[in-house]
Every structure is written in structure tokens, then in C-alpha cells.
Design a protein with these regions (language model features):
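Substrate-binding/catalytic subdomain of NAD(P)-dependent oxidoreductase enzymes
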Residues: 169-267, 272-274, 293
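N-terminal Rossmann-fold NAD(P) dinucleotide-binding loop
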Residues: 13-14, 77
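Catalytic, metal-anchored helix/loop core of enzyme active sites in primary metabolism
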Residues: 142-146, 154-157, 173, 178-182, ...
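NAD(P)-binding Rossmann-fold cofactor-contacting core
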Residues: 23-43
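Oxidoreductase and adenylate-handling cofactor-binding alpha/beta cores
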Residues: 129-142, 153-165, 195-209, 304
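A conserved regulatory-domain signal marking ACT and ACT-like small-molecule sensing domains
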Residues: 7, 305-418
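Rossmann-fold NAD(P) dinucleotide-binding segment
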Residues: 54-94
Length: 418
């Protein structure tokens, strides 16, 4: 019998509790921490101690497993988890922000106290990516792991493409349907996906967790006509989290990408998530499933609990943090991409030639291009797909183009991937 404490009793905490109560008799929830003890709940909590003092769970000697569903990278969640580990309690959490920011410290503490930190629910909800990488693929020399890691952004991009609605309208729809938070900043700015790819990068490459090294761009600058232009060139637009190893260095980044329309990742729509792992033994492994929501996330917590009950006290990162590799992090300026550019210019003779001269001078070659009249009278929209070029060179060229007098607003660009 495992005695469990649940910190936080929102959608995820309630879903986990319901699944445990219904299907597993060898687990017993003995204490739950909530914000409001007096709040009426549909779930029967008879014979369970309910408290508003969350730190009680960390020191309750009868609790062996703490399920943390509070959220947040610091404050109550951090103090609770740290104290619980010091009291030799196993941790199961859906809190990717906490681990991305404080993971190295907490993992080291967990190893010292011989307890586990399980976090399947923190990354891509219903996709068992942590277990897959840690137990099945880690020793296959993973060279790259990437995917759609935020269901809110994937839903927004899908609806913009399919229904022709602009970003702000789709975001409002997503909020009404519960696919986006009232404050969607962490989702639409790419921060949530960055937390997740940081953890996957550490797990896949055996490097310390380093969120500060993750390059981050969100989806809030993607415009409606970008989808049409991308489609004409054979692409779709997705927000991807990407971690890639190159010899003694690695990179981790989150940004919108143009992906080939016939690729697996391009076909993943709405709130679904997908993760692709590339290694030297199997090649490509693709996992697709629901990335968020009470039931998938609750099920992931249950899966971690079952694993723990079987005696699988896994090292959180697959290897001891003291044996992690010291790989150099690659700055995005030193990475190379093919780029999609959208430039709105005055519709005058010689403007395109000037842009071509700037690209040529910086040794940026054009793969595809088109030009059409802009919605703004007297202006034209030029769209270009380049061949691969290092970002620092590309950035220099874009700065030159932006300084042209006949440019309307700044150049918009999206990197291609794959």
C-alpha cells in the first residue's frame, strides 16, 4: 500500500484522484492540499484530510509519495517539493517550469535522499516520451529530439490555417473552449514549450538542465497570409521545440518553423502533440497524442505511480547528474537554416534588384520567390525561400534590408526545419 498526498486539486489533481480511486485499490490518498477547504466539490473526499497548509504534506510521516499539481517555477511548489525530498518522499509532478528552473538542484537532492522525481505528466501529457527516452532510446545515441510540445499553439496555428481567422480571434476562441489560459503568455510566447524541450534535451543528451540556454520565439507574430504563402511553397507552419546534438555541442530552441507539408509533424493538428526522436539504431521514432488536459495528464501521473510501485526508482535524468556531460551550447546565431522571408515594399522599379543585391553580397542564395500586390495600395509583397545560411550572416542581411527607405515595416521571417 502506497500512501499519497496531492498538492493542488484543480483539473489535473482531480483527474488523477478519480482514476486512482476507481481503478487502483493498492494506492491510498490520505491528504490533499487545496486553496479553499470550504469549497464544495463534486468529488467525495470522505476519510481524507483536506488542508490549506500545503507544506504539511512535505512533513507528514505517513505520506510516501507526493503528487505536486500546484504549478509555478518557485514559491509554494518549489518549497514543497524540496522539503518533501529532504523528508525522503518520492515526487510525481506535472510541473515543467519548476524542473526547468530548479531541476538540477532538485535532482541532485533526490539522488542524495534515494528518492525519485517522476515527470511524465510535465511533457506532452498523454505521450509517454520521458519513459520512452529514458528506458528505450537513451542508449541509442540520440542525435535529435523535436516536436509539437504545446497544444494551445498547435490549435491556434491549425485554426488560422484552416479557417482563415487571424491570431487574436483564434486565441479568444481557444480561451472560450478551455484550450488556452486567460493569461496565455507562457503558451503563445513559447515559454511552456521551452520548459519541455529543455528537460527533453537534458534527458536525451545527458547534459545538465539549462533553461537559460534555450532560444525562444512564440507564435504571436505569425500572420494570416504566412499560411497561404507557406502552402504555395509546399510547407505548413508549426511551433516546434528542437534539441539537437552535434559532436561535442548541442542546441535547444523553440520557434515557429516551416515544415514540409508531407512530413509527419505537419499532419499533427489542433491540440495534439507530437515528438520525434532520431537515433543511430532505430532511426526515427514518432509519438503522437494529446498533450494536455485533465485526463491525459492525470493518466501520466498514474503511469508514473505504477512504475514507482513496481520498484522502478529511476534516476530522474536517466543517469546521475554528477555524471552529466559538459557539452557546449550552440548559440542560434551559429546555426544554419533555410529561411522564409516576407518583405512589403513600395511597388517601384529597382526595389527587388536592391534586395537581391543585399542577399547576394551576403552570399544568401534564393531557392524560391514570388511577388504580388499588397493589400496596401502602392506596395508589393515579396516572398522568398532561401537556401541554408548561418543565422548571423542572415541577420546582417535582414538588418540591411530593414534599413532600406522603401520597406514598409520590418522584414518577417520564419526558419524552415527538416
Amino acid at each position: 500500500m502506497r500512501n499519497i498526498g496531492i498538492a493542488g486539486f484543480g483539473t489535473v489533481g482531480q483527474s488523477f484522484f478519480t482514476q486512482i480511486n476507481k481503478n487502483f485499490k493498492n494506492f491510498r490518498v490520505i491528504q490533499i492540499a487545496v486553496k479553499n477547504v470550504k469549497k464544495k466539490r463534486k468529488i467525495n473526499l470522505k476519510n481524507i484530510k483536506v488542508t490549506s497548509k500545503v507544506q504539511e504534506l512535505a512533513t507528514n510521516p505517513n505520506i510516501q509519495v507526493l503528487v505536486e499539481c500546484i504549478g509555478g517555477s518557485s514559491g509554494a511548489a518549489y518549497k514543497l517539493v524540496k522539503t518533501a525530498i529532504e523528508n525522503k518522499k518520492h515526487i510525481i509532478t506535472a510541473n515543467k517550469a519548476l524542473l526547468a528552473i530548479h531541476g538540477n538542484e532538485l535532482v541532485k537532492l533526490a539522488e542524495k535522499n534515494n528518492v525519485s522525481i517522476s515527470y511524465e505528466a510535465a511533457i506532452a501529457g498523454g505521450i509517454p516520451i520521458v519513459k520512452t527516452v529514458r528506458e528505450n532510446l537513451k542508449y541509442n545515441n540520440i542525435s535529435k529530439i523535436y516536436g509539437i510540445l504545446n497544444g494551445t499553439c498547435n490549435y491556434i496555428l491549425t485554426k488560422m490555417e484552416k479557417e482563415g481567422k487571424d491570431f487574436s480571434l483564434v486565441l479568444k476562441d481557444a480561451q472560450k473552449l478551455g484550450f488556452a489560459e486567460l493569461d496565455p503568455t507562457f503558451d503563445i510566447k513559447g515559454i511552456d514549450a521551452a520548459h519541455k524541450i529543455t528537460l527533453l534535451s537534458s534527458l536525451a543528451f545527458n547534459v545538465p538542465i539549462k533553461f537559460s540556454s534555450t532560444y525562444i520565439e512564440g507564435v504571436d507574430k505569425v500572420e494570416l497570409d504566412d499560411f497561404r504563402f507557406a502552402r504555395e511553397f509546399g510547407y505548413k507552419i508549426k511551433l516546434l521545440g528542437i534539441a539537437e546534438r552535434k559532436k561535442d555541442s548541442y542546441e535547444q530552441r523553440v520557434h515557429p518553423c516551416l515544415v514540409k507539408e508531407d512530413s509527419e509533424i505537419a499532419k499533427v493538428e489542433n491540440e495534439l502533440n507530437a515528438v520525434v526522436v532520431i537515433d543511430d539504431m532505430i532511426g526515427k521514432t514518432v509519438l503522437i497524442g494529446p498533450g494536455a488536459g485533465g485526463k491525459p495528464t492525470g493518466a501520466a501521473i498514474v503511469a508514473d505511480l505504477i512504475d514507482l510501485n513496481r520498484g522502478n526508482i529511476n534516476l530522474p535524468l536517466g543517469n546521475s547528474i554528477s555524471n552529466s556531460k559538459k557539452l557546449k551550447n550552440i548559440n542560434i546565431l551559429d546555426s544554419s537554416f533555410a529561411y522564409y522571408l516576407k518583405i512589403v515594399v513600395k511597388d517601384e522599379v529597382g526595389v527587388m534588384r536592391r534586395i537581391s543585391d543585399i542577399l547576394a553580397r551576403n552570399k544568401i542564395s534564393i531557392d524560391q520567390q514570388k511577388q504580388e500586390h499588397s493589400n496596401k495600395r502602392g506596395y508589393a509583397t515579396i516572398v522568398i525561400i532561401t537556401h541554408k545560411i548561418k543565422e548571423k550572416i542572415f541577420s546582417k542581411a535582414i538588418k540591411e534590408i530593414n534599413n532600406m527607405k522603401r520597406i514598409n515595416n520590418k522584414v518577417k521571417f520564419i526558419r524552415t526545419e527538416g
